[in-house]
Amino acid sequence: MTIRSPETEVKIVVEKDPVKTSFEKWAQPGHFSRTLAKGPSTTTWIWNLHADAHDFDSHTSDLEEISRKVFSAHFGQIAVILIWLSGMYFHGARFSNYEAWLSDPTHIKPSAQVVWPIVGQEILNGDVGGGFQGVQITSGFFQIWRASGITSELQLYSTAIGGLVLATLTLIGGWYHYHKAAPTLAWFQDVESMLNHHLAGLIGLGSLSWAGHQIHVSLPINQLLDAGVDPKEIPLPHEFILNRELLAQLYPSFSKGLTPFFTLNWSEYSDFLTFRGGLNPVTGGLWLSDTAHHHLAIAVLFIIAGHQYRTNWGIGHSLREILEAHKGPFTGEGHKGLYEILTTSWHAQLALNLALFGSLTIIVAHHMYAMPPYPYLATDYGTQLSLFTHHMWIGGFLVTGAAAHAAIFLVRDYDPTTQYNNLLDRVLRHRDAIISHLNWVCIFLGFHSFGLYIHNDTMSALGRPQDMFSDTAIQLQPVFAQWIQNTHTLAPTLTAPNAASSTSITWGGNLVAVGGKVALLPIPLGTADFLVHHIHAFTIHVTVLILLKGVLFARSSRLIPDKANLGFRFPCDGPGRGGTCQVSAWDHVFLGLFWMYNSISVVIFHFSWKMQSDVWGTVTSNGVSNITGGNFAQSANTINGWLRDFLWAQASQVIQSYGSALSAYGLIFLGAHFVWAFSLMFLFSGRGYWQELIESIVWAHNKLKVAPAIQPRALSIIQGRAVGVAHYLLGGIATTWAFFLARIISVG
């Protein structure tokens, strides 16, 4: 790293009182748009109001003003999250059996919702144990609270109030930084300073403070809880923080204070900063001393990372230099020009972040079962299934959003004259090769993965089981996956000799059971997994094909060379040009959402059945008795098996839930099917049909002299599609949710 002359001094500049605080203005619907502010003449107005309220690009073209609005909106977003969290903690304090659950987490089920006795719906308050009647929850909050050392409802109340105080502060912050002291554009574009502060401050100090909490509060409290001490007898958090002797009784190295730290004898601290691997056999969760160690290590790494970028001192990296130096022999100008894109297009920035965090959320979904981070999480099957499903859906939506904002960037913010022969330009120029190859891959994967199932269904139907692909006939073992599992099982002996076991028991090793229930065991992979994994590959590639085609052809195509002029969303390329409908970038996102839904559905079905068949169950003297008795390997290799032994067999709980505490899931299952079916009305019918119908209804109103002042209009083609896809996804997700929960709460 060379020492250079400092960059131009960064001055923190804010503009004082840039926008007047005016309740009169806010009270006027559509105040952000000249057209909308005039008020409604047709019913289209309300749709445009919702479409454009947060599309800050449509309010102004001034990047500084857009940046301030986004920045201010983030404060509001954080406030909403804090209010929601506060509500969760309040429910835990006011309406839950948390203290009872804490004293016996293996037999008592978590509940933090009590239904009021109106029209007989108190039937939903099932007996969850510990003399408590309520709705069983599957959010994992109880497990998080125990891991963080919360032992009483008073602590939950206090945290709930703290959340509301923080929410108030963020709301004031959002108002203050837009109306009183708004940052200038230069501040939003100062990426080096932003990286330093976010890496060292948010992630580094955030992880450090959490590690401190874990070490001084969570670890001692959980150590005592694991030993069976009554929560009411355990000292309060501030006693552990203020009285070192208390901690030293549990972790002797505390008596030595900071001496080992400054004398570099760090191994002295290994009684509370461990590197064990595997799960705590008492709770079935990761060792909390491992996770404290992890957060401390993350803090150190990110605090160092937050000192890497060059600001007012002449040392460190410049992001522009890094990007412009990034070129190889075959990549033309490399990343030259990307710095300008990422500092002037927040859509480009957002697309990258959504792609990254979407992928990360999907990785989190897998870690939540493979390395369950909280005590008693692994044996709470309803929560495990809910957390996996939730993070998979969220990840799918974020990745689809990445494609949406990448396309918006190309339509609204991309300037081809400044991007010549860099990697982005080169990708756009050979987009035909990319898309046609990807299309071929999708066809190959589709025919081959589906073909294996069709073969099996045919052989099964003809009574020829010996000719099927299965673990007992023609084997297609996932040998690469099995090799990876084996390698990871053996890894600790070589790479981490002090670790007691590998990172996850799913790789291999010994079963962990808590209270007679399986927490985790090595997950066997066979022919049925090989087949469904290729369906995963197929659905994911098709989703990517649709979304990537939308991005790469967002500005132009052979069919519509001037697509950029038509905008991000448009129904067709004007009258007189047939065959040009559904080509806008928005339409690709619309279509991509359906395939995203396909992809995630297959994944969560696979997970749900696989875990019930091969992992979850009870441990007896004869071994493990799984919920569905290992039927995945025999049945999941035919389409008929998926329909009969998964969907139909496991739907019995939700279909037969009427008259029980689970009956709400039966109603949701039914209602969500209706919502899903309702979406088809929007997706399968044309706009003209509705306009004709509306006009005859308006005629009838005129006859009766009750005609509305605001003229009714059919939804535009794009509005109709948006309503359709929203109900399709909402209906589908809620149906799956009811199906999963009724099933797993009954049998888990």
Swiss-Prot record:
Q: Extract the SUPFAM superfamilies matched here.
A: Photosystem I subunits PsaA/PsaB
- Cite the binding residues for chlorophyll a': 673
What UniProt keywords apply to this chain's record, in alphabetical order?
4Fe-4S, Chlorophyll, Chloroplast, Chromophore, Electron transport, Iron, Iron-sulfur, Magnesium, Membrane, Metal-binding, Oxidoreductase, Photosynthesis, Photosystem I, Plastid, Thylakoid, Transmembrane, Transmembrane helix, Transport
Name the EC number(s).
Answer: 1.97.1.12
GO BP annotations listed: photosynthesis
InterPro entries in the record: PSI_PsaA, PSI_PsaA/B, PSI_PsaA/B_CS, PSI_PsaA/B_sf
UniProt membrane topology term: Multi-pass membrane protein
State the similarity comment.
Belongs to the PsaA/PsaB family.
Summary of subunit composition and partner proteins? The PsaA/B heterodimer binds the P700 chlorophyll special pair and subsequent electron acceptors. PSI consists of a core antenna complex that captures photons, and an electron transfer chain that converts photonic excitation into a charge separation. The eukaryotic PSI reaction center is composed of at least 11 subunits.
Protein known as: Photosystem I P700 chlorophyll a apoprotein A1
The record lists the organism as Chaetosphaeridium globosum
